[in-house]
């Protein structure tokens, strides 16, 4: 386009941001290539020569992998050559901006458009590999003696690389045909689920290089076998909210399910579990040490890995090192806890609030719409000749009558909320939050006396039926009564496996069937427009509102 009065041509946006040609990155033995890619920017990485891995999962040679909104590191044990190039801008999905809900981000100046990228010679990968070999020795001993395998707890502050270590240990275990159960106790970001969930998954097959942990069951082809997570909903960011009165029983319920799986699955029992924790537990806040002790006890932890905190390591050594575990067989087998300090990788970077917001929005978008970014690696690995290079899902929108839904909301007051969010009348020990009200005190007492049954992982029936977790007298769950609140719009609601007549404690402790996204609320007509991952009627189950966390998600649908 010519500018008035000047014989000049304004460069078009396509020419101004034309991608640079691919760049080759050569890595020497024992080094890694660290990179950061913004949301809305796509880079393509291909392994040309040698061997390399991303968080323990090997890259296939001559296959192109795509990354967007990622901070990662590709490591090589023997040296390799990578080709890094720019990909197309992430496509929009039903009005979603290419860069996620926050909008597109300008392409970086690094190779392929990375915001930052460099080669590092000093890495802690040898330490992490040694941990894997030590765990493998314990697994071999467990198989020979009939004991349980190692139960590993990973602790450390925010942005210390805890999840990366969990991925590495999981990937190395699956390489030697082990089946670890991985537990995510961090509600700030989901594992095979949306943010605000605590999950447990048995990993039998390889992990996905591009998707991180992989993907849960979906309608469509998948190059990597899907994983089957057991999901619990904790719609709060901090596990210490209300002094941990909500987080603690959910952790107990999840631990009961995991132990039930190990009791029924010989491979899982021999391999053990890997528990990833939120950084909030390592900040020394009141109640954090008590919560760590609760996790150590419930999961019968045998190995505690501490990353990036000398103070926390000292406390863990004092409280747990060489102490007996809480396992039932600890006395007979003299099973004791080992505390190990690991170095924090220099590649760990701070993830600001804007980036974490993009991560949450991306996980929620992927849950409903799939991953629209093309991947030639996924197409090459797929067994279907007609499969596409991306997984695009088509969620189902429907109108729901608010009066027919049993929606609950946590009424925990925090400093960030308005005073009108807090209703002391809902926190009593009475039956005011039972669906429909009522005065069945005898039924409530009978429920407390009834043994709790652990919800097993998919495909496994738990044999543990007599364990009874502590029953809280005050469960801060309140049923949301008509008219439908306008703040329900643009938020997630979780459909539990609890019936609509369940008590507040049963709703809190129930596993999750799936999630709905509330796109619109019509308070006058008593209708809500919701987005579901599958079509059909919404099952008659108790529903929990994720008002506090992951909070409002604007612009998911037009």
UniProtKB/Swiss-Prot annotation:
Keyword ATP-binding on entry: yes
UniProtKB keywords: ATP-binding, mRNA processing, Nucleotide-binding, Nucleus
Residues covered by region (Disordered): 1-25, 418-455
Signal peptide segment: none
Protein location: Nucleus
InterPro entries, per database record: Clp1, Clp1/Grc3, Clp1_C, Clp1_C_sf, Clp1_N, Clp1_N_sf, CLP1_P, P-loop_NTPase
Single GO MF descriptor: polynucleotide 5'-hydroxyl-kinase activity
Positions of ATP binding: 32, 71, 159-164
Gene Ontology BP terms: mRNA 3'-end processing; tRNA splicing, via endonucleolytic cleavage and ligation
GO CC, one annotated term: mRNA cleavage factor complex
One Pfam family linked to the record: Clp1
Family assignment from sequence similarity: Belongs to the Clp1 family. Clp1 subfamily.
Function: Required for endonucleolytic cleavage during polyadenylation-dependent pre-mRNA 3'-end formation.
Subunit structure comment from the entry: Component of a pre-mRNA cleavage factor complex. Interacts directly with PCF11.
Protein name: mRNA cleavage and polyadenylation factor clp1
Species, as recorded: Aspergillus oryzae (strain ATCC 42149 / RIB 40)
